[in-house]
Each structure stands twice: as structure tokens, then as C-alpha cells.
From Swiss-Prot:
One of its GO terms (molecular function) is DNA binding. Residues 1-151 form the HTH marR-type domain. Disruption phenotype: Mutations or insertions/deletions that inactivate MmpR5, or decrease its activity, lead to increased levels of MmpL5 and MmpS5, and to non-target based resistance to azoles, clofazimine and bedaquiline. InterPro entries: HTH-GbsR_regulator, WH-like_DNA-bd_sf, WH_DNA-bd_sf. Induction: Negatively autoregulated. This is HTH-type transcriptional regulator MmpR5. Homodimer. The gene is mmpR5. Residues 53-76 bind DNA. Controls the expression level of the Mmps2-MmpL2, MmpS4-MmpL4, and MmpS5-MmpL5 transport systems. Also controls its own expression. Acts by binding directly to the promoter regions. The keyword DNA-binding applies. Keywords: DNA-binding, Repressor, Transcription, Transcription regulation.
Amino acid sequence: MSVNDGVDQMGAEPDIMEFVEQMGGYFESRSLTRLAGRLLGWLLVCDPERQSSEELATALAASSGGISTNARMLIQFGFIERLAVAGDRRTYFRLRPNAFAAGERERIRAMAELQDLADVGLRALGDAPPQRSRRLREMRDLLAYMENVVSDALGRYSQRTGEDD
């Protein structure tokens, strides 16, 4: 029996569900929700690649509210997208094309926002002694460095693969 035979959790291959559970454990170990990891794991391997909220709830033995909440989180992180199908009132989700590159681009945006917040903090400190502003400067400088490094790496990856977001 293969994943193509349906989205029923009991019908999925044990190795597939083991992978899905490992993704959940990985996310949980990173202080995210286990269900978000399982949802991402399932969308990495399911067929068809587009899954309704109901199909996801069945496949993952999860509540529709849990699917909705965790799908919103994964959308915010840039990994998945919501789809509308003409004539169908259900909500569908799928992995975004180049999902992990998109996720890294979202992380770059978050780094830029945190740099801006560090600048707000530095302005608020005004003429405070340098030892008081040191932590904010370190935060801003590291984030600026990481933003450049990750941006450059994504650019090289896109050139190498010939793919864009």
C-alpha cells in the first residue's frame, strides 16, 4: 500500500508515517509544535501534493483547529501556501515551490525587522554609556552579518539550480 492509496493515516506506509513523526519530533525539539512538524512532513511526501484541511486532519489524526493553527504558522514561516480551487469551498494547502529557500527568505526578512528593532533600542538609549548599548549593537551587527551571508548563499543556490523562489 502506498501514500497514493489515500490520506488515511492507517493506509500510509509505516516508513512514511515514521518520517512524519520524526519531523514532528524535530519541530518539537526546536520549541515549535509537534503538529507543525508533522504537517510539514506530510506535505513533503503526500500524494496528491495538494491536501484539504479535512484530508490533513485525517492523515495526521489531528483536529481541524490544530491543522488551521499550524498551517497558519507554516504559511508565516514561508513553507506552505493556501490554495483555492474553483468550485470547491474547501481550503487546500501544499508545500510552496522551493519551500525551504522561501523559508530562508522569510528568515532574512525577520532578521531585517530585528535589526530595525535593535536600532530603535539604540536610539532609545541615546547617549548611554557604550557598555549599556553593547548588547543591542552585538544583536544588530550579527543579524546584519547573517542577513548578508544567508542572502548570498541563497543567490548562489538559485544560480546553481537555475530556480527562483
